[in-house]
Regions:
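HotDog/MaoC-like acyl-thioester-processing domains
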Residues: 1-18, 80-84, 88-149, 230-294
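Hot-dog-fold acyl-thioester-processing enzymes
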Residues: 2-68, 123-223, 285-294
Length: 294
């Protein structure tokens, strides 16, 4: 495989992300469950892969990436615990303030793990995920997502990024490419959240009730975009988190949920947004017993 031109591409080091969710029995991260569903083993969450990009994005755009930047990725290949991967970002023009570039991740053998865009400011073109044709499904054909409709609210709550948990993840090697800003002083004052922690903030509690309505099933991240509106997201600071369904999708093996979520501070200032595509595996759901039996 050819080496990227350093004048055109910023390449990160090869890293071996850990599957820190392998202990969650019955999830896609559990070896036994994932193997039963046709995967090579328990998968590393796509949000974990996002943590390899900030050093490249700070080199590309400066600290401003954490203030008005985005990272928009569609996941193409599920990796397993410790499998080596490398992040790349197209090098922007010097001094770019409203710019968008290509971002991607591969294995050392050249398998594409994720692809999309990274930006700062307000570039003219849409991000990788906002440029996709979502092709909504016929709701009457859905089983796992039958209780949801585009426009539905996913909730309104307060949540925060746990600074102690983030520091523990760093010390245990669970945050693949840590910045000093995640555990100590940053250009904005105190510690800030890594991309995977921003995803957790805008996903975990917000999806708790909708997941109950879906019934037993196994899901995985299909695509994630985080965008800082007035960032960064600080550790140990409470944010109001809201979200809504954008679209529902259907394929032979999955039902898909596209949703947007938002974090605002106590003053009502938008801090960060996320667009996520969640894949629900039909073979894992009692709603699709025929598929599971096949």
């Amino acid at each position: 495989m050819s080496t990227p031109d350093p004048n055109q591409t910023i390449a990160g080091p090869v890293r071996a992300p850990r599957n820190r969710a392998a202990h969650i029995t019955g999830s896609i991260h559990d070896d036994a469950t994932a193997s039963k569903l046709g995967f090579r083993g328990g998968t590393v969450a796509g949000s974990v892969h996002m943590d390899q990009f900030p050093p490249l994005l700070v080199e590309a755009f400066g600290p401003a990436w954490f203030e008005t930047g985005s990272l928009s990725l569609y996941f193409k290949f599920a990796t397993t615990d410790g499998e080596p991967v490398q992040a790349f970002v197209e090098r922007p023009a010097p001094g770019a303030t409203d710019a968008q570039v290509r971002a991607w991740m591969t294995t050392p053998g050249g398998t594409l793990v994720a692809e999309g865009t990274a930006s700062v400011g307000q570039p003219a073109q849409p991000t990788a995920l906002f440029s996709r044709d979502l092709r909504p499904a016929d709701p009457s054909q859905l089983r796992i997502l039958s209780a949801l409709r585009p426009g539905d609210s996913l909730g309104d709550l307060h949540a925060s990024v746990n600074g102690a948990d983030q520091r523990t993840a760093i010390s245990e090697g669970g945050l693949t490419e840590p910045l000093d800003w995640y555990s100590g002083a940053s250009p904005w004052g105190g510690p800030i959240a890594s991309p995977s922690r921003v995803v957790q903030l805008l996903y975990r509690d917000l999806l708790a009730k909708p997941k109950q309505a879906m019934g037993p099933h196994v899901g995985l991240f299909g695509a994630i975009e985080i965008r800082f509106r007035s960032g960064p997201v600080f550790a140990d600071q409470a944010y109001r988190v809201t979200g809504e369904v954008v679209a529902l999708a259907d394929s032979p093996k999955t039902e898909g949920l596209w949703y947007d979520s938002h974090a605002t501070d106590d003053a009502g200032t938008p801090v960060a947004d996320m667009r996520m595509y969640l894949r629900q595996l039909k073979a894992s759901s009692p709603h699709y017993r025929d598929a599971a039996a096949g």
